[in-house]
Amino acid sequence: MENRQFEAMLAVAQERLAQHAPEDIAEKAGTQYADGSFSLKTLEQTVTVRLSDCTIQPPLSKWHALTLLHYLDLADGTPLTGRTITFSQYKDGLVRGGGLDRNAELIVRRDLGILPPEELERRCGSLGAELLPSNADFCARFDFAPRYPVWLKVWFSDEEFPASGRLLLDESAPHYLTIEDAVTVGSLILDQLTGAQHWAV
């Protein structure tokens, strides 16, 4: 059932992409377009997306690939604001986004926040994250797509408090992906940082 549902979503994404001028997509999504394919970087991997059949090389997990196609379809070129929001502050994000916010907090407290900082840095680096100064003990910026950054902020545990943390998005994020897609992006990043395989197929 889930596979049929996924195939249907993929077919819709392909149809929608075919309705745009490719040069228009490239400009709004911040990608390159040449020889019938888009080229872009996603979480440290440079991939090409062939417009004719939406195949992606090198291959990505199916939900990663579908979300990237949605990004190319929905991107409207809105500039990044530099102001961050939580997933629950996303347009229509109260339920789905709030769930991701709580899940991220739990994963930081249980898994990521108890790692030695160098190990967390190594895991973030494997996804191409850039470490940034911030008000948290640890802050990394992941680029899911050229105009879709995600920040992980972690406060490590001490004698008084357990570790805490959150994933954040730029305020412009709803111009590029729906809340459902945003939750997929957050889940993909958390999965890869913890070694879980929920979204890896």
Residue ranges and their predicted role:
Residues 170-201:
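A recognition module on extended beta-rich or small alphabeta surfaces enriched in W/G with H and D/E
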Residues 24-51, 130-156:
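Amphipathic, interaction-prone secondary-structure segments
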Residues 69-76, 189, 193:
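Generic structural signal for hydrophobic core residues of well-folded globular domains
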Residues 1-35, 64, 71-130:
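Short Lys/Arg-enriched alpha/beta "domain-start" segment
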Residues 45-70, 155-180:
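Intrinsically disordered, low-complexity regulatory segments enriched in Ser/Thr/Pro
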Residues 58, 106, 110, 138, ...:
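Short, charged/polar micro-motifs that form catalytic or ligand-binding hotspots
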Residues 115-175:
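Conserved binding-pocket/active-site segment within a compact domain
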